[in-house]
Curated annotation (Swiss-Prot):
NCBIfam families given in the database record: tsf (TIGR00116)
Coiled coil: none
Gene3D superfamilies recorded: 1.10.286.20, DNA helicase RuvA subunit, C-terminal domain, Elongation factor Ts, dimerisation domain
UniProt name for this protein: Elongation factor Ts
CDD domains linked to this entry: UBA_EF-Ts
Source species of the chain: Anaplasma marginale (strain St. Maries)
Lineage per the UniProt record: Bacteria, Pseudomonadati, Pseudomonadota, Alphaproteobacteria, Rickettsiales
Length: 291
């Protein structure tokens, strides 16, 4: 099967594999992008097992925290020109404020809720109206809402800020802690949110990581190791070692804290708990980025 140059380039951008390898993968998989990714992984030519948090060509991420609640959303645009437009920024800010107020946890219910900007229409209709004014496609492509169920804090971080709480990437993280809301705990939550933006974990713990994702990765790793021709006892240890590295990349608690490059997040939580005299636990997080 003949595949297009654009598809080859897209696969290369996603996987980091060579152009020739990407062409071979797409031809072998009849142009199926997802199957081609797996093909390259099995050949040991790609490490692209993380899902993308960027499904819009451009746009902005907006985040807002008030007390024990936090909201985050991704507003997509076709170009950077529109993303820098003041009306687009204002829309993102107004939408995230509305999300914080309504506390919606899924995109469809929030889109159907009343827009709080005074226009008397739904959130979805306001986005359509904005697109007409701005002259290109605008899409509300993701939302996140966190609310504490007990003592703790919610931290946030925006990367590439273009305004207060608005930028190119952002994260919310909810921490459970029985101590009072100290500046130290709030700063710790902010640092964790910063880490999440940089490290892009897929789950809080190994237990909450998708079973399908884990099994698919184990199958891919097993095929890679099988090609080495090692004895079964040795191959099994190699598979376990590679899976541990997989977890260290994908799981927040297993990741190494970006700000010191040595401490695992789970150990960081333990250390902070000792400093504060209480247990500190990550309840949940939300992450979005564009561009």
């Amino acid at each position: 099967m003949k595949v297009g140059v654009e598809a080859i380039r897209e696969l290369r951008q996603i996987t980091g594999a060579g152009l020739g390898d990407c062409k071979e993968a797409l031809e072998t998989c009849s142009g199926d992008m997802e199957k081609a990714k797996v093909y390259l992984r099995e050949k040991g030519l790609s490490k692209a097992y993380k899902k993308s948090h960027r499904d819009a060509a451009d746009g902005l991420v907006a985040v807002r925290v008030e007390g024990d609640k936090g909201a985050i959303l991704k507003l997509g645009s076709e170009t950077d020109f529109v993303a820098r437009n003041e009306k687009f920024r204002s829309l993102a800010a107004e939408l995230v404020s509305s999300l914080l107020k309504h506390g919606a946890e899924d995109l469809s219910s929030f889109s159907a809720s009343p827009y709080d900007g005074g226009s008397g229409v739904s959130v979805a209709d306001e986005v359509v109206n904005a697109a007409a004014v701005l002259g290109e496609h605008v899409v509300l492509s993701g939302i996140g809402f966190l609310e504490l169920g007990g003592p703790g804090v919610i931290g946030s971080y925006i990367h590439g800020a273009v305004g207060e709480g608005i930028g190119r990437a952002g994260a919310l993280v909810a921490l459970e802690a029985t101590t009072a809301k100290t500046e130290a705990l709030l700063e710790f939550a902010r640092q964790l949110a910063m880490h999440i933006v940089a490290a892009k974990p897929e789950s809080v713990s190994v237990e909450t990581l998708s079973n399908d994702l884990v099994e698919r990765e184990r199958e891919i790793v097993a095929k890679q190791v099988e090609a080495l021709g090692k004895p079964e006892s040795v191959a099994s240890k190699i598979v376990d070692g590679r899976m541990q590295k997989f977890f260290e990349d994908m799981v927040l608690l297993e990741q190494t804290f970006i700000m010191d490059g040595s401490t695992k997040i789970r150990d960081l939580l333990h250390n902070k708990g000792q400093d504060l005299g209480c247990e500190v636990r990550i309840v949940a997080y939300r992450l979005f980025s564009v561009g």
